[in-house]
A protein has these predicted regions:
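Short turn/helix-capping motifs enriched in Asx and small/polar residues
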Residues: 1-76
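Structured interaction and signal-relay segments at domain junctions
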Residues: 69, 78, 135-145
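Extracellular structured ligand-interaction cores
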Residues: 6, 117-119, 206
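Charge-patterned, phosphorylation-rich low-complexity C-terminal interaction regions
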Residues: 77-100, 104
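Short beta-strand scaffold segments in enzyme catalytic cores
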Residues: 118-126, 210
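Active-site-proximal loop/helix of nucleotide/amide-processing enzymes and allied scaffolds
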Residues: 20, 25-39, 145-226
Length: 226
């Protein structure tokens, strides 16, 4: 699920830690942390690494995109109620197919691992090759704080948000349907209600919301009426 941020929709701005341009290689561990970052002008690529930092073997553990597909990578810090100071990573990816491919690659390898760390995807702008996708992770088991914080802290202002997706390691339904999730929060249902109301109050079209269910690789829609 993605917990609620204290940042107001259409306002607020977290602290920017890292601002990296594209044309890179990223080596990522099962928590979604960037273990190594290598500069290259050949392509944009991601490799999963094991607990020792070694690249994992197999076609499912790497993905490659044309040069400058990843427009930018940023990391932000925030105060988490449970973990204290925490951070979340954001990859800005050009093109809906590319953004979805990276989102599902990271979800399959990270959310689908024993860490159960969730991944988020925000699809903005024009649909198709010109769309700008934001792929997020806050490196936390069964939670994705980056989605909510990014929307309410930055891209809720000045971006047309078309779709908001996040991964689930097990449940094929949104958290919070019974009032609270395992952590005692309103979970996905509280978040979608707040975001929907915020979009309406800002005069924006309400985005569509989906869960990417990793065990079945299905994209499951949900709404405030779920």
């Amino acid at each position: 699920y993605f917990p609620v941020s204290p940042y107001a929709f259409c306002a607020g701005n977290p602290v920017n830690l890292i601002d990296l341009e594209g044309q890179d290689i990223w080596e990522i561990n099962s928590y979604g942390n960037i273990v190594r970052h290598l500069k290259t002008t050949r392509s944009d690529a991601f490799f999963m690494v094991d607990e020792y930092g070694n690249r994992m073997i197999g076609d499912n553990y790497s993905i490659e995109f044309p040069y400058k597909t990843v427009v930018q990578q940023n990391s932000y810090t925030y105060l988490d109620d449970e973990k204290g100071i925490n951070s979340y990573d954001v990859y800005r990816v050009r093109g809906d197919k590319n953004g979805t491919a990276l989102f599902e690659f990271l979800a399959d390898n990270i959310t689908g691992s024993p860490t159960k760390v969730e991944i988020g995807q925000i699809m903005t702008g024009l649909e198709g090759d010109k769309g700008l996708n934001f792929i997020t992770t806050s490196h936390t088991e069964r939670r994705e704080a980056g989605l909510m914080k990014l929307i309410r802290g930055q891209i809720g202002y000045g971006y047309t948000i078309r779709e908001v997706n996040h991964s689930h390691p097990k449940d094929a339904f949104p958290s919070g349907l019974t009032g609270s999730d395992e952590q005692g929060n309103g979970g996905d249902m509280e978040a979608i209600k707040l975001l929907t109301n915020s979009m309406i109050s800002c005069g924006a079209k309400v985005a569509s919301f989906h869960i990417y269910h990793v065990p079945t690789k299905r994209k499951i829609p949900y709404s405030v009426k779920s």
